[in-house]
From Swiss-Prot:
The protein's assembly and partners: The APC/C is composed of at least 13 subunits that stay tightly associated throughout the cell cycle: APC1, APC2, APC4, APC5, APC9, APC11, CDC16, CDC23, CDC26, CDC27, DOC1, MND2 and SWM1. APC5 directly interacts with MND2 and SWM1.
Function: Component of the anaphase promoting complex/cyclosome (APC/C), a cell cycle-regulated E3 ubiquitin-protein ligase complex that controls progression through mitosis and the G1 phase of the cell cycle. The APC/C is thought to confer substrate specificity and, in the presence of ubiquitin-conjugating E2 enzymes, it catalyzes the formation of protein-ubiquitin conjugates that are subsequently degraded by the 26S proteasome.
Classification lineage: Eukaryota, Fungi, Dikarya, Ascomycota, Saccharomycotina
Subcellular location: Nucleus
Pathway(s) this gene product operates in, as recorded in its UniProt entry: Protein modification; protein ubiquitination
Coiled-coil residue windows: none
Family, similarity comment: Belongs to the APC5 family.
Pfam annotation, one family: ANAPC5
Keywords carried by this UniProt record: Cell cycle, Cell division, Mitosis, Nucleus, Ubl conjugation pathway
Protein name (Swiss-Prot/TrEMBL): Anaphase-promoting complex subunit 5
Annotated gene: APC5
Disulfide bridge partners, by residue number: none
GO biological process: anaphase-promoting complex-dependent catabolic process; cell division; chromatin organization; positive regulation of mitotic metaphase/anaphase transition; protein K11-linked ubiquitination; protein ubiquitination; regulation of meiotic cell cycle; regulation of mitotic cell cycle
């Protein structure tokens, strides 16, 4: 249990509100020449104003101002309020005045007098009314002003509140003060707090007789003399009260802080705010005391718990929190939250490559979004489905809607004005044209449209989309063989980092795969076998799976197991043609099959395949792949004793071959072997 007691949500005023009201009273009364700075009121009142729920799934974090610029909401704890006051140059005087007022309030009657005095002497309807009060020595505020709006709201809440609500605020105020009196700040100031002086100031303008005041004090004394162990009807309300708006602001900020802190960690930097962990711990201590009844009315708290559990790798807790969010939102007033919750669940499953569960959630979310005619969320679901298929293309056939249909739907979404929708549409069109081996001109056209729409917007507003653009540029130019261009994009991409936890975890696995390929080059077969065995126990995405398949094939070729390697190659080529349309990996496995035949001294059997592939890539317009196949053809010719034809073939195409640094080493090896063979022929003659 938190030392601040259970957290309770209320529509009535809170001890935190009462502190602000006291500061307004002191500011208007000009006690001891006090003038509370506007910045202090802004800092304290802003979190209590209505704010929209901020869901990290639906909102773009980059559109928010940086958390390092906007100060965090003040927690409903007196220690935090006093520390905010002490940041000002006259903070000591203001803090002492606040503590004096709080100590002077000795019952509901004191709160009543404070509220009446504020309404009577500090609040006016408009500036004209203010000018009419020429005899007033107090500062005054209009109802429409920033302070006036807050004051009017609090007065209205207090007036419509019943006796039980007022008793609750009094009881919670005692706990509010008691907790503070166990802090070092209280020990620092307690000897300078002047209670009687504040009492006199508060009562100075009250129209209450001496006899009435004595009667009030008598009954207060009489009540205090009762049995100290007696129960009150609201004993369960001891703890910390908070308004719905205030709690919303705190949870919103905590989510933004979590995302910012995670991004710092993923970039290898330390969090700049030294108070992040302390503040986060305090917020979670308070939220953990929230009753289940209140939590069900405030499901966003479960998103916060979900994010925190993900950070701590507590996946079961994360899943439970997400299910709670799903359950409580689905029973709320807003129908659209039902499919938003399902979408959240789908993205969670896909993050851990639990594809079957993700697909079920995606389809259910799509169905309900259509029933509710929520086009904005439906667009978002479509984008997430394509993102899922991009990572797991082998599951594309499991959806009732095809990628082509989704792209057409997004491109024709005339009822939305969000440029990101159209950027994503052309992004997926580019992806589809790449994997389906479209002509180079068509791929280039789609990529150019994707770039034009994405760069028209500020890239920082959707950095993930901008990163996708850069990664597609890298892939496009690399497959065409122009590494000088792809390197430019790759260097830029390496300097950026996504805040996605899935990307972070995947990067670790991808690094292991790179180490395994390096071990294969160094003939460290034991390490390669260890990585291959380890990969069997992991949930991997498509790229990781296909890379490991490629590693297995190259490993088998390296150890001379040509029969098994050829069987696996044929299986993988079939998968790339039927289950997944992946021309890039199909080409790599086709090249490996040619290598196996060459190593088996039956390279001539690969001749029909080489000729067919050359014709195919000439039609598509991929010069790099044509050159790679040309060199394989030369190896076959050399193997069957047609070295002169091979040399002639290289010589005729040398200018094209030298355009691609990727194949220069192999070209040099072939020319060197041809030169050695010519020398041998000369010696024989």
């Amino acid at each position: 249990m938190s030392k601040y007691g259970p957290l309770g949500i209320t529509n009535f005023i809170t001890p935190y509100d009462l502190c602000i009201l006291i500061l307004i009273h002191a500011h208007c009364s000009q006690d001891n020449g006090i003038s509370v700075p506007t910045a202090v009121f802004l800092r304290l009142i802003s979190p209590t104003r209505p704010s929209l729920e901020w869901n990290p799934l639906l909102k773009d974090n980059s559109n928010l101002r940086s958390s390092s610029i906007v100060p965090p909401p003040v927690l409903p704890i007196l220690d935090n309020i006093i520390r905010i006051l002490l940041d000002d140059k006259d903070g000591n005087k203001i803090a002492l005045t606040l503590m004096g007022y709080l100590e002077a309030i000795n019952g509901l009657d004191s709160i009543n007098r404070l509220m009446m005095d504020l309404e009577k002497n500090c609040l006016v309807n408009n500036y004209r009314s203010m000018k009419m009060r020429t005899t007033s020595t107090r500062r005054q505020m209009t109802r429409a002003s920033f302070l006036g709006t807050f004051l009017s709201t609090c007065i209205r809440k207090y007036q419509i509140g019943d006796f039980e609500m007022r008793e609750t605020i009094w009881i919670n105020l005692q706990n509010f003060k008691t907790v503070f009196k166990h802090t070092p700040l209280w020990l620092r100031f307690k000897d300078n707090v002047h209670i009687q002086k504040v009492k006199n100031c508060l009562l100075a303008n009250d129209e209450i007789s001496v006899e009435d005041q004595q009667m009030v004090e008598f009954f207060q004394h009489f009540n205090n003399g009762n049995d100290a162990d007696s129960k009150t009807m609201n004993e369960e309300n001891y703890g910390t009260l908070i308004s719905i708006q205030h709690l919303q602001s705190i949870v919103n900020r905590q989510i933004v802080n979590w995302l910012d802190n995670t991004e710092f960690n993923l970039m290898g930097q330390e969090e700049t705010s030294s108070t992040y962990e302390e503040q986060s711990g305090l917020v979670f201590d308070l939220l953990d005391t929230l009753s289940l009844n209140d939590a069900t009315k405030f499901p966003l708290i479960f998103i916060l718990k979900y994010l925190e559990a993900i950070k701590e790798n507590s996946y079961q807790t994360a899943l439970d929190s997400l299910h709670n969010y799903f359950d409580y939102k689905s029973t709320g007033n807003s129908q659209n939250y039902f499919h938003i919750s399902l979408l959240s669940l789908a993205t969670f499953h896909s993050s851990f490559n639990e594809c079957d569960a993700a697909i079920n959630s995606f389809e259910e979310a799509t169905r309900i979004a259509r029933e509710n005619k929520d086009m904005e969320t439906l667009n978002l679901i479509m984008i997430w489905i394509i993102n899922f298929i991009e990572v797991h293309p082998e599951y594309a056939n499991r959806f009732y809607i095809t990628v082509e249909q989704i792209i057409k739907y997004l491109k024709n979404s005339s009822d939305v004005e969000d440029a990101n929708i159209f950027s994503n549409a052309y992004k997926f069109e580019t992806l589809l044209s790449m994997v389906k081996e479209s002509k180079t001109a068509e791929v280039s056209s789609s990529l150019l449209k994707f770039m034009a729409i994405t760069l028209q917007n500020v890239p920082s507003q959707n950095f993930d989309l901008f990163q996708s653009l850069v990664s597609y540029e890298v892939k496009f130019w690399k497959e065409l063989g122009y590494e000088s261009i792809s390197d430019v994009y790759e260097k830029f991409l390496s300097k950026t980092s996504s805040s996605s936890l899935r990307n972070y975890d995947s990067s670790i696995i991808n690094q292991d795969i790179k180490v395994a390929f390096k071990a294969l080059e160094e003939d460290d077969f034991l390490k390669v076998k260890q990585y291959l065995l380890k990969s069997e126990s992991l949930e991997l995405d498509y790229d990781q799976k296909i890379n490991l398949k490629y590693l297995r094939v190259k490993y088998l070729v390296k150890i001379g197991d040509y029969d098994l390697s050829m069987r696996l190659i044929n299986q993988y080529v079939k998968e790339c043609c039927e289950e997944v349309a992946d021309s890039n990996w199909r080409f790599k496995f086709e090249i490996e099959s040619i290598n196996v035949l060459l190593l088996s001294d039956v390279g001539i059997r690969s001749l029909p395949k080489i000729i067919k592939l050359i014709d195919e890539y000439k039609e598509i317009g991929n010069p790099l792949r044509c050159v790679i196949l040309l060199l394989k053809l030369c190896e076959v010719l050399i193997q069957v004793g047609k070295s002169m034809e091979a040399e002639c073939l290289i010589s005729c195409n040398l200018s094209t071959i030298l355009e691609f640094p990727f194949v220069r080493k192999k070209t040099d090896e072939l020319l060197e072997s041809l030169s050695v063979e010519e020398d041998r022929d000369v010696q024989m003659t």
